[in-house]
Amino acid sequence: MNNMDLGYEMFCYQCEQTANGKGCTKLGVCGKTPEIANLQDLLIFQIKGISCYGKVLQNEGQHIDKNIIRFIENVLFTTLTNVNFDSKVHVELLNESQRIKENLRTITGEIHNQTSYATYDLPETKTQMLKDAQFAGIMYDKSLDPDIRSLRQTILYGLKGISAYGHQARELGYYSDEVDEFYIQALEALTDDNLTVEELIRMTMRTGEAAIEVMKKLDEANTAVYGNPAPHRVNIHMRKGPFIVVSGHDLKDLEMLLEQTKGTGVNVYTHGEMLPCHGYEGLKKYPHLVGNFGGAWQDQQKQFDDLTGCILMTTNCLMRPRESYKGRIYSTNVVGWEGVKHIGKRENGEKDFSEIIQQAIELGGYPEDQEPHEILVGFGHHSVLSDSDKIVAAVKAGKIRHFFLIGGCDGARPGRNYYTEFAKMVPKDCVILTLACGKYRFNKLDFGEVAGLPRLLDVGQCNDVYSAIRIATGLADAFGTDVNGLPLSLIVSWYEQKAVADLLALLSLGIKGIYLGPTLPAFLSPNVLQYLVDTFDLRLISNAEDDIKTCLKQNI
């Protein structure tokens, strides 16, 4: 299945919305062109080659330069769904990858693992790079065992998810040496044709362990810098005056923008996965952080269309900007789209947001206040576990029957209304935990209270799967059981590679019976999927009513 033999212009199946559930071959459903897709294949090929040399240094007991780790992390993040669509950026990264590889070659000398990844030299022109990219394609090696390919891609997509969390933590000055070393180990393993299916399954579980470690580090970074999230009411309607909408996941960018907008009269709204920022004391202390705008990422084109303010994209998910707002949207970090203004970082780590602030002022914003409407956020592990005695007592008294974690990535597929229906059908004596942008399917509904607690607890961003794990293990300890013994069901929606990292994290802990949807990943071969079903009782969602009955082991 060489994509060139089949007349494919590209091949990508890393996200949930991949064409026909099999793979994008002409244009990415995400908006990725064949040119970008092929440059990304070559970038991944290059960092695998870098890792072949890096592994030699690791085996000699040496640590890899953190600048190289940062580069690998940024490349992985750049190739994640809905992050960067700018070919110029990709060519710059490719040229840098060759410089790093050549530098490592001079340090290591000739290495034992002389794979094509290690020995390949990047040509000078983009045209030639694109010609070479076919050799880096996922389907290039027609003789490769489909289970080996499936596991390699699963590991790679897990690494992409880890890189997003690692990047966020590193922006705050936090990183894990263990995860940094693992990037090299895992990428090098993807070049090793001697590894068996069993060995790659072990590496897949290690990827899940690395995902937990990086989420733990990001939780540590966010809470050390901004405090523990605490319950907080957030206005989801607009206030009078000029404004900037901040999307993505990066708390540091939001803080810098809030600092620079102080006293300017510009209001700041979160969007998408930035909603949980309102729970952090270090961010909600700014009075001009006035609320949250809109819904999940897939609605952005419609919702940004007639905005009378500016938009800042700090991480994914970026969709093709419509002409109506292309002049009002800015990117930063690894995010990019050709023709969209990019705000870079100075050597001291600061960013200059003066242009976006000035444009927001000129646009004028909203002419009048809308009637306020509030939702509740801020239920991280620290907040929830401080009430654990109360929760345990309520469960033992029969006041709380069951917990449902309904969360993950949202997306455009019609079948995702399952998650809305599910949340609405959850019995009144059950608690719903939610996280990531999947929450927008139901987080504006009123679920009321049970046993003196809100029935809907917003745990945070996609990386706050770590918070959910802490809550689950904390409650399990209180009940003297393990997570699988809790009255807890996990109903997970996935879209991009952070969700892959999250799923692998849960599986690496031995958590069973997870419901995954709206469809299964195209990159899972039948045998790999069967292994996950047999080992972890992984289930595809069916319909909300039947799945709730199964979770509760009885009628609603």
Task: Specify the residue positions occupied by each region the protein language model found.
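Anaerobic metallocofactor- and corrinoid-dependent redox/one-carbon enzyme cores
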Residues: 2-19, 32-36, 48, 66, ...
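Long, compositionally biased, glycine/small-hydrophobic-enriched stretches that function as flexible linkers
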Residues: 2-228, 233-241, 245, 265, ...
